[in-house]
């Protein structure tokens, strides 16, 4: 039985019902429907913290999904899981791949910036200010891109850019 039919969360159940109705009404191929089912089940598993199961579903969705825009969200969610697992290099790779397919994902730019900022902080703790500055500069570039896509969002990042004089 698909995960979406077993989930007890009201919001997830509502989403599943609406998604199932849309899948019946909107003309799509069986492959697209199957890809969406895996994606939906991946989101459900991810929201419950079942990352291994979520990754399996996302990889299946990637195998079936042909639309670059839809693939970008699958890749983004895979990046989120790697971020949660502390696998920052993998996370950066998946965010980058998502942005290759959809350059209008400010949340991917933001998450990449957060990882770079974290690495800058780590470099400071290790006494390497030159490496730290390089990571902070990269974080600034990613945050600028996120802010450009969604002005008014990422207020803390915007303030950090001003305070550190990285905002142009």
UniProtKB/Swiss-Prot annotation:
Protein name: Photosystem I assembly protein Ycf3
Cystine residue pairs: none
TPR repeat start-end pairs: 35-68, 72-105, 120-153
Similarity comment text for this entry: Belongs to the Ycf3 family.
Transmembrane stretches, start-end: none
Organism lineage string: Eukaryota, Viridiplantae, Streptophyta, Embryophyta, Tracheophyta
Task of the protein: Essential for the assembly of the photosystem I (PSI) complex. May act as a chaperone-like factor to guide the assembly of the PSI subunits.
Family matches, as InterPro entries: PSI_Ycf3_assembly, TPR-like_helical_dom_sf, TPR_rpt, Ycf3/AcsC/BcsC/TPR_MFPF
The keyword Repeat is assigned to this record: yes
Keywords: Chloroplast, Membrane, Photosynthesis, Plastid, Repeat, Thylakoid, TPR repeat
Naturally occurring in which organism (per UniProt): Solanum bulbocastanum (Wild potato)
């Amino acid at each position: 039985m698909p995960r979406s039919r077993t989930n007890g969360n009201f919001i997830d159940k509502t989403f599943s019902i609406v998604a199932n109705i849309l899948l019946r009404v909107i003309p799509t191929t069986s492959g697209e429907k199957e890809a969406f089912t895996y994606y939906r089940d991946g989101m459900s598993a991810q929201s419950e913290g079942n990352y291994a199961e979520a990754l399996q579903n996302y990889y299946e969705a990637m195998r079936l999904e042909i639309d670059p825009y839809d693939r970008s969200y699958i890749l983004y969610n895979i990046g989120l899981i790697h971020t949660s697992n502390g696998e920052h290099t993998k996370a950066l790779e998946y965010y980058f791949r998502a942005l290759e397919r959809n350059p209008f994902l400010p949340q991917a730019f933001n998450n990449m910036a957060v990882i770079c900022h974290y690495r800058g902080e780590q470099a400071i703790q290790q006494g390497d200010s030159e490496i730290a500055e390089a990571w902070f500069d990269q974080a600034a570039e990613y945050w600028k891109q996120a802010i450009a896509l969604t002005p008014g969002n990422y207020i803390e990042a915007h303030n950090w850019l001003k305070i550190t004089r990285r905002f142009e």
